């Protein structure tokens, strides 16, 4: 009888420990890595934000679209290749994300959006867009 109780208690403990382990387990995804050019960023902007992409917002929206994918994947590396990128609003960089600028990358801050919302004063925010207080897009 004592042996049977001991086996039952041990089984209950094993189940409890396994349950706690699964309860605190976080989803781990493969981190995303992207290499982008101005034209690739523009295409991503049109794909992700078709209705609000303008000639003024195409680069900021496209970069944010790539960074949103990286946030969902738990981070990664965004390599920005040579070219000029026009930025009207903030680019949000999520946790566990590295942004690499190759030689010849130029960011130009512009104050037009071509839409009914205003351009922001900042170019970079070190937090994910999903956690930003004031969310325009």
How should these model regions be labeled?
Residues 3-10, 14, 18-137:
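Extracellular/periplasmic carbohydrate-active domains that bind, remodel
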